[in-house]
């Protein structure tokens, strides 16, 4: 596993220099170079990606000849780089980050550095935006975050991208708050210790780090609702309405309206179609063996929100994917959000 400090250094370099240098490195993760062992990059241990990836590992190993090595990472943006280099065969990423990477837009790390080798395998479940705080901070709306100390997620992560998008939507820029960058588990510790006022945490509920925090510390979750939610939805069609059910976390008894993106499995175009088809069938023919987000993961919805071209191996399982792909509109900070929709058939 890459250490947090080393990973942060790598991501800082990526953001500063783009991915051009990284793409010239040939990795060793692709299955055809590794026999039957596949590398699967997940996310932090306090989120949903890591435990779900380990459930996928069990299902795949029980139903194919492959063995799976699951690696904890900084999640979406870092995982895109791993797929591009060939260091990972499969990875979990957000569908909005996949779109930005494939099109070379949206965030600084990808500007002008389109990752055209990125391919989709399947979408999975809503990645719910949690804005977690403590009741004593008095933070009740997104607008109240101005002037606060906020953990926006690991540097370069999809969580950080979403956090800055949402804050910018209500007129809060990085000059208007003190930003901290750490994993979900570290963010929970910071909230518990009073070192930050709020944290953005993006993932399928319930998130382990927040569940654990709520057992020892009073928490509240900030609503993204009303006009604010409409502004966020208008800023990017890759956001969708969502809700955290009351009782998901101790002490949070009422439903919390919010927004979400979509979790997806991605791969590299160079991975063989047979390998991708075998892994995909193993997962989607054995969803009854899953316990995490199992209600959302099905063959019927596996192409919902697919934002990049589908790998031929996945197309053999699901058929062609005709999706609505966004077109970009640049914002004041240089990040691109999406205001238009263009139909794209993602078949290759």
Descriptions of predicted regions:
Residues 1-348:
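Hydrophobic alpha-helical segments
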């Amino acid at each position: 596993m890459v250490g947090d400090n080393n990973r942060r250094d790598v991501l800082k370099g990526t953001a500063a220099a783009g991915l051009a240098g990284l793409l010239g490195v040939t990795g060793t993760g692709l299955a055809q170079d590794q026999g039957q062992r596949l590398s699967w990059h997940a996310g932090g241990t306090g989120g949903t990606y890591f435990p779900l990836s380990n459930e996928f590992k069990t299902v795949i190993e029980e139903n194919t000849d492959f063995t799976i090595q699951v690696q904890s990472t900084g999640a979406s943006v870092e995982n895109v780089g791993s797929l591009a280099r060939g260091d990972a065969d499969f990875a979990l990423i957000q569908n909005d980050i996949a779109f930005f990477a494939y099109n070379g837009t949206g965030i600084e790390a990808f500007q002008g550095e389109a990752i055209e080798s990125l391919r989709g395998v399947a979408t999975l479940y809503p990645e719910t935006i949690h804005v977690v705080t403590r009741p004593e901070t008095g933070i009740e709306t997104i607008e109240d975050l101005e002037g606060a100390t906020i953990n926006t997620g690991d540097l370069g992560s999809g969580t950080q991208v979403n956090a800055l998008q949402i804050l910018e939507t209500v007129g809060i820029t990085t000059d208007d708050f003190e930003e901290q960058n750490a994993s979900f588990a570290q963010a929970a510790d910071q909230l518990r210790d009073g070192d930050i006022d709020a944290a953005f945490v993006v993932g399928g509920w319930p998130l382990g780090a927040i569940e654990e925090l709520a057992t020892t510390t009073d928490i509240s979750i900030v609503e993204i609702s009303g006009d604010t939610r409409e502004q966020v939805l208008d800023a990017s069609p890759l956001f969708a309405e969502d809700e955290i059910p009351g009782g998901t976390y101790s002490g949070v008894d009422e439903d919390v309206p919010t927004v979400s993106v979509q979790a997806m499995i991605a791969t590299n175009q160079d991975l063989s179609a047979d390998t991708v088809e075998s892994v995909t069938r193993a997962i989607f023919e054995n969803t009854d063996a899953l316990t995490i987000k199992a209600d959302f993961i099905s063959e019927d919805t596996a192409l919902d929100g697919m934002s990049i071209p589908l790998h031929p191996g996945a197309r053999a399982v699901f058929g062609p994917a005709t999706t609505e792909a966004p077109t970009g509109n640049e914002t004041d900070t240089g990040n691109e959000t999406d205001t238009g929709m263009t139909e794209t058939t993602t078949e290759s």
